[in-house]
C-alpha cells in the first residue's frame, strides 16, 4: 500500500444527512461490505499515511463519531462539527481548528466515496507536488453527468473552474468531465482562500469548488482523471447496492488470487475484515460477516451464514448452517441446518448435525450431536454421543444452569437433562429419560415410566364397545313430543 513520504493531513466530509437515502440514519452510516460508508475514505487516507485525519460531522454527529472510532480504533482521528450544513467550503472550514498549527498539504475527500483506492489518493497528492501547483483535483468522465459539477479548462487544458450544474450554461452542461470531489491543497493557502468564498450561486451555499479559480491564479491547478467507478459518490439505495457489489467483488478477487476457491463470485457476500485461508472452498450464497476467520482447506456450504465465527483448518460446514460468535476446531463437521450461537466451542473432529442448536457450550474432541438436539450451557466430553432429540434444560426461569457430560458418555435419544446436572464419563442414559440427578461414571440411568403391555387389549375393547351398542338400543322419545319418524 503506498504511503506518502511527506507530511499529509486529511479532511473527510461526513456531515450531510443524505435525503435521497430516505432514511432516519445518516448517509455515511449506511454500510458497504459491513462497514459505514465513511470508514473507507478514512481508512484509505490512513493507509496513505495521513495524520491527522479530521472527520467533519454534522447530522447525527455522535453516532458517526462513535461508529468510526470503533471501526478504526488505532487511526489518528480528530472530529470537527459543522453545526449548520452551509456548503462544502463551510464544512472544510469547520476542520480548521482541528488542524491548528499544521503546515503542509491537506487531502480533502468526501465521506460517501467508499470505492476510492489509496493509489488514487496518492496520484492526486503527487500530481500537485510534481506540477508544483497550488491545488490538485480529481476529475472523472461520465456518460450521464447529471448532478455533478462540470470541469471547465483553460486554453492550455488546465482546470480553470468548476461550475455546479444549477449554475451551468447549456454549453457547460454538455461537458462530460466532472468534479470527483477529491482535492489536495496546501493548508496555509486553503484557509486563506476559503475566507474569500461567498454564496453567489443558485444554492446560496459556500462551495469548495470556488477554491479552483482562486488557485488557478495563485499557482495553477493540476487535474488528475480517476476511474468513475472509484470516485462516484453514494447518494441513494441503488448506488449503495452497486457500491456494495463492487466492494464485495474486489474482496472476492483478492481471496481468489490468494488461493481461495469461490465457486460463484457473483453469489458471494462478505464483509471487509473477513479472513479466508488458502485452499478453502466457498460455495454459492454464503455470507461471511464481521471478523469471521475461515481456515485453510475448510469448505463452507451453500447458504451458510457466519458472523464473527472462527473456523480452524479443514472444517466442513454443510449447507444452511448459521454460526454466530463461535469457534470450530480442526476437522469438525457442521450441519446441514445446524446453528452455533455465541459461546459455542466445537472441538476437533466433533460433529454437530442437522437441526442441532449449540449455545455457550463446548464439545470435546470427536463428540457427536448428529441431529435434533439443543445443547445450552453444557460441557460435553471427548467422544460423547448425544442422541436425537436430547435437550439440556438449562434455564429455570431465573438463571442459566450448567450440564456436564463426561468423556465417552452415551445419551440416548429423546433424553431431557434438567440442569444443573452431571453425567459421568462412560455413563449411559437410556432413551426417553428425564434426569434431574447426577449419573456416576460408568452407570446406566433410566428416568422414564416402566412399560406396561396388555396383550389382546384392542380386541377386548372392541368387543366391549359392541356389547354396549347392542344393549343401549334407540333412545326413548321425550314426554310431550312425538317420536321422530324414520325415513321411508
Curated annotation (Swiss-Prot):
Annotated Mg(2+) binding sites: 112, 235
Catalytic residues as annotated in Swiss-Prot or TrEMBL: 371
Chain intervals for the UniProt region annotation (Linker): 238-258
First-listed, main subcellular location of the protein, grouped into a coarse class: cytoplasm
Cofactor binding remark: Binds 1 Mg(2+) ion per subunit.
Region (Pyrophosphorylase): 1-237
Function of the protein: Catalyzes the last two sequential reactions in the de novo biosynthetic pathway for UDP-N-acetylglucosamine (UDP-GlcNAc). The C-terminal domain catalyzes the transfer of acetyl group from acetyl coenzyme A to glucosamine-1-phosphate (GlcN-1-P) to produce N-acetylglucosamine-1-phosphate (GlcNAc-1-P), which is converted into UDP-GlcNAc by the transfer of uridine 5-monophosphate (from uridine 5-triphosphate), a reaction catalyzed by the N-terminal domain.
NCBIfam families listed in its UniProt record: glmU
Protein name: Bifunctional protein GlmU
Gene that produces this protein: glmU
Amino acid at each position: 500500500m503506498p504511503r506518502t513520504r511527506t507530511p499529509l493531513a486529511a479532511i473527510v466530509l461526513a456531515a450531510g444527512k443524505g435525503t435521497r437515502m430516505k432514511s432516519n440514519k445518516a448517509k455515511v452510516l449506511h454500510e458497504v461490505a459491513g462497514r459505514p460508508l465513511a470508514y473507507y475514505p478514512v481508512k484509505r487516507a490512513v493507509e496513505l499515511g495521513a495524520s491527522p485525519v479530521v472527520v467533519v460531522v454534522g447530522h447525527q454527529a455522535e453516532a458517526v463519531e462513535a461508529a468510526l472510532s470503533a471501526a478504526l480504533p488505532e487511526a489518528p482521528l480528530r472530529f470537527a462539527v459543522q453545526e449548520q450544513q452551509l456548503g462544502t467550503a463551510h464544512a472544510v472550514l469547520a476542520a480548521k481548528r482541528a488542524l491548528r498549527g499544521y503546515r503542509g498539504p491537506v487531502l480533502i475527500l468526501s465521506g460517501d466515496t467508499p470505492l476510492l483506492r489509496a493509489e488514487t489518493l496518492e496520484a492526486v497528492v503527487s500530481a500537485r507536488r510534481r506540477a508544483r501547483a497550488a491545488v490538485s483535483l480529481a476529475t472523472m468522465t461520465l456518460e450521464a453527468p447529471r448532478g455533478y459539477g462540470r470541469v471547465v479548462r483553460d486554453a492550455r487544458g488546465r482546470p480553470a473552474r468548476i461550475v455546479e450544474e444549477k449554475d451551468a450554461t447549456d454549453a457547460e452542461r454538455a461537458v462530460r468531465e466532472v468534479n470527483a470531489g477529491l482535492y489536495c491543497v496546501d493548508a496555509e493557502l486553503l484557509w486563506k482562500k476559503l475566507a474569500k468564498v461567498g454564496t453567489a450561486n443558485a444554492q446560496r451555499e459556500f462551495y469548495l469548488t470556488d477554491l479552483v479559480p482562486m488557485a488557478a491564479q495563485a499557482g495553477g491547478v493540476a487535474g488528475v482523471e480517476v476511474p468513475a467507478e472509484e470516485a462516484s459518490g453514494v447518494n441513494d439505495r441503488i448506488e449503495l447496492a452497486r457500491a456494495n457489489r463492487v466492494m464485495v467483488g474486489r474482496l472476492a478477487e483478492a481471496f481468489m488470487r490468494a488461493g481461495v476457491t469461490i465457486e460463484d463470485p457473483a453469489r458471494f457476500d462478505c464483509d471487509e475484515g473477513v479472513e479466508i485461508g488458502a485452499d478453502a472452498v466457498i460455495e454459492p450464497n454464503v455470507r461471511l460477516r464481521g471478523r469471521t476467520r475461515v481456515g485453510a482447506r475448510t469448505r463452507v456450504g451453500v447458504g451458510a451464514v457466519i458472523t464473527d465465527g472462527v473456523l480452524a483448518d479443514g472444517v466442513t460446514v454443510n449447507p444452511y448452517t448459521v454460526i454466530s460468535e463461535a469457534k470450530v476446531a480442526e476437522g469438525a463437521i457442521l450441519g446441514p441446518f445446524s446453528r452455533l450461537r455465541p459461546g459455542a466451542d466445537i472441538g476437533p473432529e466433533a460433529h454437530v448435525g442437522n437441526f442441532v442448536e449449540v449455545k455457550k457450550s463446548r464439545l470435546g474432541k470427536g463428540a457427536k450431536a448428529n441431529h435434533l438436539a439443543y445443547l445450552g450451557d453444557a460441557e460435553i466430553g471427548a467422544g460423547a454421543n448425544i442422541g436425537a432429540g436430547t435437550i439440556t434444560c438449562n434455564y429455570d426461569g431465573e438463571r442459566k444452569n450448567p450440564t456436564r457430560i463426561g468423556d465417552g458418555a452415551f445419551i440416548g435419544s429423546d433424553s431431557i437433562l434438567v440442569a444443573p446436572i452431571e453425567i459421568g464419563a462412560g455413563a449411559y442414559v437410556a432413551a426417553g429419560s428425564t434426569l434431574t440427578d447426577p449419573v456416576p461414571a460408568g452407570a446406566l440411568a433410566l428416568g422414564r415410566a416402566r412399560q406396561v403391555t396388555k396383550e389382546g387389549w384392542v380386541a377386548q375393547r372392541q368387543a366391549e364397545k359392541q356389547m354396549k351398542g347392542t344393549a343401549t338400543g334407540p333412545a326413548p322419545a321425550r314426554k310431550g313430543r312425538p317420536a321422530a319418524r324414520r325415513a321411508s
